[in-house]
Amino acid sequence: GLTVALKNRDDSLSAGNDNYFSVQTVALGTDLPAPLRLQVTNTGSSPLAQLLVGAYHAPNRPDKPPLVLEGEHADEGVEVPASDASNGAYAQFTLAQGAWQALASWQLDHNQLETLDGRLYTPILRFYTPLPAGLLQFRVALSFPGLPPALGTTLYQFPAVSATEGQGYLMLAPLRLPFEARLLNVQPSPLLFSLQAYAPGSGSLTLKLDDIFLLPQENFTWFTSSVGLPVNASLIDDAFLQKTYTLANAKEMHTHHRIGDYFYLPPGETSWFFFFQVNPEGLAPIDLPINVKAWYRKRRRIL
């Protein structure tokens, strides 16, 4: 099987800052989708509470899809260097209370949108500091960049999601990028990805956004637990047996509930598997470490 060491980040500051692994399934010699067995070992110093895994399968696409929007790349924020932030910095934003506000935005060009391929993604916000008290809400809006606001440039506005006080991450409503049907041999138009926020009351709040991770939903599983995966224990997700369990001190136990499909490797494609981790305090530090080992079972079509 394949074994890789992963972190809770995907940037280019140093080798090994990866939250994914990839498999070239062309070399596996399988004619049918091959079930996958994953063993995720917690190599950190505290339990692992939430683990979200999303796969991106694509033929003839050698490059990894661009799934990270760094907070400091949004023009509306103030960049703050920080060694414990994704890409070495986060962005600080001022949110005026009492009305919805376009907090941060990123322009997605046609090359990025072609790679995103009209698929479904869940945006996961990672905050540098836990969210303050108050009924904070967040949502995403898509628009064409460069047009005057008077023309009503919002193309699609996704449902709002309420945040939890003290939490360091937030899963937003899934969205499709680009959201319209893809036309063969026609480049998609650039889009402005806008993060909007609302806080009741008057005055203002300061929000510190590290990054947004677009987790693929095509082949997706969410492992959730109130207990957590103990240090040095392994979470086994076995598509061979359709079974998920934890292995700790040579004993099998159940620590996590799973939501989603079991994983597979489609024939003749490149498959990327992306991981997002949350600790029991509801935070998502960038250097949470895991080791992932994967096996597949070859399947053949017999006539």
Regions found by a protein language model. Give the residues of each.
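Contiguous mid-protein beta-loop-alpha structural module that forms a pocket-lining wall or clamp
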Residues: 1
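Intrinsically disordered, low-complexity segments enriched in serine, threonine, and glycine
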Residues: 5-303
